[in-house]
């Protein structure tokens, strides 16, 4: 086997090792996140999601699977990725500051009882941290997907929030667990709404 193949395999092995470790420490906060989301949507609320770069893609991924479906047919669930409207983002970034692009949307769209899914691998993304502050001002629950100890965002969370913090320092590995956590969240919400289905 060549060095390149060995390096590629190392990525797979490292990712698998982290996921096994994360299964032990993240199952409880993910289950708590499921309950927070269920309480929100069954009361007629919605989930707002945000992030930057790969985390923005994860926010869109989550919203697509909530509004559409995950693996089973069901009515759409209310979710909005705040990073998808380029007109709003560029207007807010230009007229205010890039750190305000999500907080302003939370102020405009969020209601008490809604949930903010805040995704940042470092926990230090200024615009995501500002969105968390705005969500608290609107009496929303925050579900934070972070890594590296949670950063500034972790320090802002309250007792009613949920912190899903991946125990790793490397961005790529954290992102890989984030998308698995999102899939676990989507699956568990479906199970609670539709009943059990075998994992095959």
Swiss-Prot record:
Keywords: Carbohydrate metabolism, Cytoplasm, Isomerase, Metal-binding, Zinc
Zinc recorded as keyword: yes
Free-text remark on how the cofactor is bound: Binds 1 zinc ion per subunit.
Binding residue positions for substrate: 52-54, 65, 94-95, 120-122, 125, 175
EC category: isomerase
EC number: 5.3.1.28
Binding-site positions, Zn(2+): 61, 65, 175, 183
SUPFAM superfamilies in the cross-refs: SIS domain
Molecular function in Gene Ontology: carbohydrate derivative binding; D-sedoheptulose 7-phosphate isomerase activity; zinc ion binding
Catalyzed reaction equations: 2 D-sedoheptulose 7-phosphate = D-glycero-alpha-D-manno-heptose 7-phosphate + D-glycero-beta-D-manno-heptose 7-phosphate
Main localization of the protein described in the UniProt heading: cytoplasm
Stated role: Catalyzes the isomerization of sedoheptulose 7-phosphate in D-glycero-D-manno-heptose 7-phosphate.
Similarity comment text for this entry: Belongs to the SIS family. GmhA subfamily.
Full protein name: Phosphoheptose isomerase
């Amino acid at each position: 086997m060549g060095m390149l193949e060995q390096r590629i395999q190392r990525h797979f092995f490292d990712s698998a090792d982290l996921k096994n470790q994360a299964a032990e420490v993240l199952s409880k906060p993910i289950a708590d996140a499921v309950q927070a989301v269920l309480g929100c949507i069954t009361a007629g609320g919605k989930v707002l999601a945000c992030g930057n770069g790969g985390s923005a893609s994860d926010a869109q991924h989550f919203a697509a699977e909530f509004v559409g479906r995950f693996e089973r047919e069901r009515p759409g669930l209310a979710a909005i990725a705040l990073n998808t409207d380029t007109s709003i983002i560029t207007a807010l970034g230009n007229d205010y500051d890039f750190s305000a692009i999500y907080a302003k949307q939370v102020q405009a769209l969020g209601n008490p009882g809604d949930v903010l899914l805040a995704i940042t691998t470092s926990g230090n993304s200024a615009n995501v941290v500002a969105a968390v502050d705005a969500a608290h001002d609107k009496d929303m629950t925050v579900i934070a997907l972070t890594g590296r100890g949670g950063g500034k965002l972790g320090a802002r969370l309250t007792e009613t929030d949920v912190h899903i913090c991946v125990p790793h320092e490397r961005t790529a590995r954290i992102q890989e667990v984030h998308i698995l956590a999102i899939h676990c969240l989507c699956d568990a919400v479906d199970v609670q709404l539709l009943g059990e289905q075998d994992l095959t």
